[in-house]
């Protein structure tokens, strides 16, 4: 895509250029978009502990930034960035850094070399001051090129367990950030809370490598009005609301289970169901059509919901359904356990029944919330039992019929929230720029 021209400040000096790099899943894209918003806010304030004097102090920087999103050729991130932001986007060749088939591996290495060359040329032309990577194959060629061009980098690990690309890039990056301290044992690094890391970073201490920032989410999650969010979906005050979501690509096993359970669930609740764009809406609509009309009205089906709220309605209230509005409106969620649950569910204090997708380390994300009393977990295999004796129905029924337990889970979830995570990552980018300028 064609890049937009870098805007200039009134004094004639261009803002610093930041690259936000990531792709493959929404869990890699949404954190980058949240950091873009923080950079655009010109250094929102937050408080860190003064480890020397035992006092708290406000940290604020007001560097002006201009951001470019860098994704992979043919990746899902291009459409997602276009829908959710106004950021310019540039696509680079990228591929997996491993493969079982020797021929595929050779092709991937050629693609990696092409991507690294393209990234190096783009760096020379665009001159980024710092680069944030949030995961995905596209980070590899960008970070290799950045290393050659001496551009400072931060790699951010959204999930508890890092993928191969992040484990490799953690060795190249100037700083590594993570959502939760549990990631440290997988990266072979000692995690340091952001508040404790700041004084050491300011003194050019290079021994601090892994910094716990939390998972960055849009600030609207912390400020959205629950009553307004429920109104935009037309929800009743007399029934609890279940949010069903499978992540940025949907979740067929969850969708099929919910379709089978609709006759049992809808007499007890309203459902907001974000099913994804893989065609599952067809069988879900068929399942709802055979139910009585009064139950059909309790089912709100969407293939996709934009993340950012539209507040163009009267009195600044949400005027259209959005994912943020759905999260705030719900009393309980049923969802996968991609990286976003580590930030979004705590931000709104939403208890959840988590059904991790197998094979991609979602179990560890789920376990993080389950062990802290903010969620319960059912296996993907258990979703096949779509009777009222099945694990999914029993978990939903128990939690929606026990407001006290839901409230306790909500409080424990909110205790895990990191409202300043995006600002912290923005602060790390600025710290690297200052380091380079004063080196």
Swiss-Prot record:
Pathway: Cell wall biogenesis; peptidoglycan biosynthesis
Membrane topology: Peripheral membrane protein
SUPFAM superfamilies: UDP-Glycosyltransferase/glycogen phosphorylase
Subcellular location: Cell membrane
InterPro entries per record: GlcNAc_MurG, Glyco_trans_28_C, GlycoTrans_28_N
GO BP annotations, alphabetical order: carbohydrate metabolic process; cell division; cell wall organization; lipid glycosylation; peptidoglycan biosynthetic process; regulation of cell shape
Primary site of residence: membrane
Biological role: Cell wall formation. Catalyzes the transfer of a GlcNAc subunit on undecaprenyl-pyrophosphoryl-MurNAc-pentapeptide (lipid intermediate I) to form undecaprenyl-pyrophosphoryl-MurNAc-(pentapeptide)GlcNAc (lipid intermediate II).
Membership in a protein family: Belongs to the glycosyltransferase 28 family. MurG subfamily.
PANTHER family with a match to the protein in the record: GLYCOSYLTRANSFERASE, UDP-N-ACETYLGLUCOSAMINE--N-ACETYLMURAMYL-(PENTAPEPTIDE) PYROPHOSPHORYL-UNDECAPRENOL N-ACETYLGLUCOSAMINE TRANSFERASE 1
Protein name in the entry: UDP-N-acetylglucosamine--N-acetylmuramyl-(pentapeptide) pyrophosphoryl-undecaprenol N-acetylglucosamine transferase
Organism: Roseiflexus sp. (strain RS-1)
High-level lineage: Bacteria, Bacillati, Chloroflexota, Chloroflexia, Chloroflexales
Gene this chain is encoded by: murG
